Amino acid sequence: MQGTKIRLLAGSLLMLASAGYVQADALQPDPAWQQGTLANGLQWQVLATPQRPSDRIEVRLQVNTGSLTESTQQSGFSHAIPRIALTQSGGLDAAQARSLWQQGFDPKRPMPPVIVSYDSTLYNLSLPNNRNDLLKEALTYLANVSGKLTITPETVNHALSSEDMVATWPADTKEGWWRYRLKGSALLGHDPAEPLKQPVDAAKIQAFYEKWYTPDAMTLIVVGNIDARSVAEQINKTFGTLKGKRETPAPVPTLSPLRAESVSIMTDAVRQDRLSIMWDTPWQPIRESAALLRYWQADLAREALFWHIQQELTKNNAKDIGLGFDCRVLFLRAQCAINIESPNDKLNTNLSLVANELAKVRDKGLSEEEFTALVAQKNLELQKLFATYARTDTDILTGQRMRSLQNQVVDIAPEQYQKLRQNFLNSLTVDMLNQNLRQQLSQEMALILLQPQGEPEFNMKALKATWDEIMVPTTAAAVEADEAHPEVTETPAAQ
């Protein structure tokens, strides 16, 4: 398999070189983002958005620790610490702290004040614009959370007797599909929603806090209509006094490759059967232009595929079928799914409809007309790039930045994006797109059926037989497909 991978990579580079856009140039970070690292290791990133004067000021503090750093005896510590933080005034007087949290909440886009996951803890504040006093208080509060919490039996008991405002990612860590996806991963034994073991030892929570809440493992992000230089100075003054340094690296969360199985999972997450045709591959960080162009090509191929299937279903007047497409990065595994919403008794028929279209695209590709329409649409979107950017509010900009950091993607300036994207669209051909589609559709795929609780379990063997009859290639085609197995870059989305 190593040889296959190497052959493929060489083939991909030759294909891109023939289009004239392989470059090893490092992507240049968007200079609109001011960023730095304090002497104690804390990283900060600030974006001033004068084009959005009425938007709220978004503040995020990410601590690179979560439930994966807990031992069995420490279960629940990573969830308990922010609970304790939310019941303390954080260096402010009690009235100031109350006011900060009342105003630091966007009623239009409510977000939990803290989200704990396997590898991170995220503190969220959304402040009214033109309130520099509140921003100063928010930074004071977060700096206090970062290294000055009071953890005693009394403060722990007070926190545990108060309402739990700390959310987890994912929101339901025990949901059936999620537990299935974690099989074979160390994450399965480190649930961020796990309660504290009794009796609670405050001294052990304090030791855990001091070990993992160190400034060199923190990133602070501020986005809004602010004076970036003034905010940077305030960050240095407020956070610069924090002490501590990581002596033990945090475990890196990993997922096992998605198994190409056909499974039915009962869950409360759906009200109607949802069948997902799913594949996953290693996510490749995007730090240089050639990687970005490879990602764009794979991404555009997937979008073209979705357009094609939707149009064919509409043309054939398909009933009782809903179609969705979803790509995301989960702990550096890129996962994509074609989701079919269907009544239980139409599942086999609807899978057959979609699989037939997938097989046609894999074997014959998209038509020149479809390709031309897609590129025209993308060129139109590119012409509106700056208008779109100006309409993007601070909440969205902050979320995009968080995802880029998480997925190791360099954010580039709109001007650089426009230039690279235009060159990419001008160089793209229908043959290149069809080759990429062939590669993606020749991978082994899983059939994951989510069923509402209480529904009779569907016969997955029947679905698998339908799929195999249409999609499993002949022996000769299978060999060709294996040699074309893609180096994959998948669509980033919110964890």
UniProtKB/Swiss-Prot annotation:
Query: For this UniProt entry, which segments traverse the membrane?
Result: none
The record's keywords, sorted A to Z, are: Hydrolase, Metalloprotease, Periplasm, Protease, Signal, Zinc
Give the signal peptide, or none: 1-24
Record-level GO cellular component terms: periplasmic space
Superkingdom in the source lineage: Bacteria
Disulfide bonds, which pairs? none
Q: Name one GO biological process term.
A: proteolysis
Say if the entry is tagged with keyword Hydrolase: yes
One molecular function GO term is:
metallopeptidase activity
Q: Which Pfam families match?
A: Peptidase_M16 (PF00675), Peptidase_M16_C (PF05193)
Location in the cell reads: Periplasm
Query: Is this entry keyworded Nucleotide-binding?
Result: no
The extra comment attached to this record reads: Has lost the active site residues.
Give the family from UniProt: Belongs to the peptidase M16 family.
Which protein is depicted? Protein YhjJ
State the organism of origin. Answer: Salmonella typhimurium (strain LT2 / SGSC1412 / ATCC 700720)
Q: What is the lineage of its organism?
A: Bacteria, Pseudomonadati, Pseudomonadota, Gammaproteobacteria, Enterobacterales
Q: Which gene encodes it?
A: yhjJ
